[in-house]
Each structure stands twice: as structure tokens, then as C-alpha cells.
Amino acid sequence: IAQVSIDPAYQLKPEAKKSAPIDKMLGADISFLPELEAKNIKFSDKGLEKDAIQILKDHGFNYVRLRIFHNPAQPKGYSPTKGFCDLVHTKEMVKRAKALGMKVLLDFHYSDYWADPGKQFKPLAWEGKNFSDLKKSLYDYTYEVMQALKAQGTLPDMVQVGNEINHGLVWPEGSFSNTDQLAQLINAGTAAVKAV
């Protein structure tokens, strides 16, 4: 039986308000869109060139999913030369989606690169931190991203604290073999989301 420590520094706050229920959710992960557009790739619907997000909306989509990496521009990151899926790109994408009336699911990878069941490498900036500082870094980063989105009036409608965390997140501290620490990291990220 797993036991989970509750860190009083990351107490969960109740939600400020409940989202209005929706009849259906139909969404797409459009995180690649800025990369495709940077390559001058165009999108069309029945021969008419349109914004890709508008095409989704026109076909009944009401949600988009956007991933965010901690620092994808660092040399071993996801996008060393462009920084795709960083906070700057994510803010712009959320703004575009919200302007078209789409809802947004924000997916925190807590890595500079892909995080999935086979790898959950912590950001380079968090390497060497003790667990308490690692947890604080995860909280602070989550809070800063949420605050930045709130400041531009585009808070996400849903947040995914970690990507594909079947085997944990922010390895090795948050691996599934360290369930107490994993739970504390998830709790810290969730607390940061709810604090905004």
C-alpha cells in the first residue's frame, strides 16, 4: 500500500468556479502548428486556404491541446534553434485558439524534451536539486506559466499536470517506484494550477 505525504506548502485550494458543462468535446493536439507554419505550410478546406484552427472549428472541433516544454531551446531540448512549445509560442497559440472561441487543454511536459512512458527527463535547469527544491521548482514553473496566461486573459480550460505519466514524471525522483514523491510532485503542480 502506498503512503503519500501531504506537504502543507502545496495545499490544494478549491476551484474558484466550475466550468460550464459542454455537450461534447472534440479536440486536436495542434502543438506542431507553429513549426509547420514556420516552414510555410498552408492549410485549406475544400480548396480554400484558411487558418488551421479555423478549419478545425468549422468542422465541429471545440478543444485544442497544447504541450509546453520547460526550455526546448537548450541544446538537448526539443527545438534547440527555435524553442517551439516554449512559453512564448504557447502564449501565442492559446491566444489564437481562444480568439476563435476554442477551449484549451494545456499539457505540461516538465521536461525540455518529450516526456512519455519511456522517458520523463527533468529539465536541465532542475538537475542536481534536492527533492524539496525540485518540488518547489515544479510548483513555481507551473504557477509562472499559469500567471502568464492569466495576464493575457487566456487561462486554459483544462490542465494536464505531466504528460503520459504512467511510469511517473521528473525522473528519477518522481518515478513510479517512488510513489510518495510522485504524488507530492503531482500535488505541487495541481496546487499551482489551482492557485491562479
Task: Enumerate the predicted regions with their spans.
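Bacterial Sec-dependent N-terminal signal peptides
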Residues: I1-I6
